[in-house]
């Protein structure tokens, strides 16, 4: 990850890392300094003789830069150490690999707390990449721009691996996402596809000089990682020529995609659902007692099939909380599935706000507020309230040059949505707290507002 800090490196111990590959630095993060602080033994050891008291299983570190860092291999030097004997050993290792063995310990983003290491197998990610590529109709003639992080399933599976299985050209616009760099790559490389989370597409569409880029070669891609606002999807299709843009839904624990829209789905379906279930995957919607609901009824979405992870690494308790004895992955998402099999994600089970006994779904309010011409992005969540149990709060990023107030928001909502769904509190911000993969962290927004407003959590029986 490009946003790592020393406290996050507990992963080295958690998953018993034996070899670590690192860049020298990225933006404000100096990885070499972090590692030398954590592993002082590096200063006095040979690269192949690392013995770290805090990380006893770590055998060696490889750094990709040009510096000769004490105790570490340079990537190029390490590559040159390989000989014919090593190649022969690799062939032997390859013959002993099995499809159900772990290939990736993928840490979840942690929108609600400490990340967990999802154990993904060869079967999990290779097949998921294959079906995603087929949904996008990727071929050897396509050129896919991948500005999303490669340390996340979005970049690794839906980007790199999907290109490998289809023979598609990969285009990387930069070390990290930059809207201008991405637009320039799309234009110069005549890309036919591009991936991104909603905030990335929003950033590109709002770039100064957006109209100067020729994006007519584009046709497809995936927008995923967070709920896609309807108005944003319409702009992506009309202004970026992505008429075959797909929406994908899933989670790290399901390798990641379980639902995806087709390139020829009606635009109405693509802006209002996450598509239909992927091949060889099952889905169901259940109520709080676990009863399977009828078509169109709302409840928690469960998925099952080849794509479900083996479990959280060395964490059977949290694995059992997420995957039941019948193999169903409990997604934590509220959803409906219609008679044609299209799934609509209503929100997170934990994000649902209960105001005065009324169930309020933040995404519904977010979709409505995004129709306001002065609002660029919005996140809605609940905060404690002595009278109603919870009240509605909205964090808003305004369009450039616009000012938004609580009165503006309330008057815009008045008569258009139910009174109990109208935000009681509004905070105008320039950005949201996000995970490194671009997902808004509502729990941090909730904590900030609770503290700023001096609210107290209401105790319930």
What are these regions (language model features)?
Residues 9-13, 20-24, 194, 289, ...:
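AMP-binding/adenylate-forming catalytic core of the ANL superfamily
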Residues 59, 418-439, 458-461:
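AMP-binding/adenylate-forming catalytic domain of the ANL superfamily
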Residues 16-19, 40-62, 143-145, 171, ...:
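Conserved helix-loop-beta element of the AMP-binding
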Residues 126-143, 153-193, 207:
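Conserved AMP-binding/adenylation subdomain of ANL enzymes
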Residues 79-83, 183, 188-196, 205-269, ...:
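Gly/Ser/Thr-rich phosphate-binding loop
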Residues 54-58, 63-69, 73-107, 114, ...:
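Conserved pre-ATP/AMP-binding loop-to-beta segment of ANL
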Residues 85-88, 99, 104, 118-139, ...:
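Conserved structural elements of the adenylate-forming
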Residues 1-6:
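Short, small-residue-biased leader/transition segments that mark boundaries at the very start
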